[in-house]
């Protein structure tokens, strides 16, 4: 009887240890994997040329409309970006399409895609 009691105790200990091992295997990874990033998507914007004084560079004003978080009023915000214009084709007042690109200089990260509308 003593032998059975000892083996029974060992069996419960080993079962408890096995359950503990099984519980650790059922847990997920130690860290949460990051979601996959969308590849090949560059930002495109439409804006108006405000300066063409630099060589192969234009300054374009981008307009964004944002709703005020508390009052709900639509607010117009503008941002000026420097854009690479290889052929110096755009002039002041032109409506242009831009695309994000790799850094071309200290401040240039956009390139001219096309001139949508010439200034009058």
From Swiss-Prot:
ATP-binding is among the record's keywords: no
Low complexity composition bias: residue spans: 1-22
Region feature Disordered, mapped onto this chain: 1-46
Keywords: Ribonucleoprotein, Ribosomal protein, RNA-binding, rRNA-binding
GO CC aspect terms: cytosolic small ribosomal subunit
A Pfam family hit: Ribosomal_S17
KW RNA-binding (keyword) present: yes
Function: One of the primary rRNA binding proteins, it binds specifically to the 5'-end of 16S ribosomal RNA.
Protein name (Swiss-Prot/TrEMBL): Small ribosomal subunit protein uS17
Species, as recorded: Mycobacterium ulcerans (strain Agy99)
Gene transcribed to yield this protein: rpsQ
């Amino acid at each position: 009887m003593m032998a059975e009691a000892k083996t029974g105790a060992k069996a419960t200990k080993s079962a408890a240890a096995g359950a503990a091992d099984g519980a650790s295997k059922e847990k997920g990874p130690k860290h949460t994997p990051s979601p996959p990033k969308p590849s090949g998507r560059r930002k495109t914007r439409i804006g108006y040329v405000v300066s063409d004084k630099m060589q192969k560079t234009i300054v374009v004003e981008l307009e964004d409309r944002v709703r005020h978080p508390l009052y709900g009023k639509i607010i117009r915000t503008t941002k000026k970006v420097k854009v690479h214009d290889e052929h110096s084709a755009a002039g002041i007042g032109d409506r242009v399409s831009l695309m994000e690109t790799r850094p071309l200089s200290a401040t240039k990260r956009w390139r001219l895609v096309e001139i949508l509308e010439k200034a009058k």
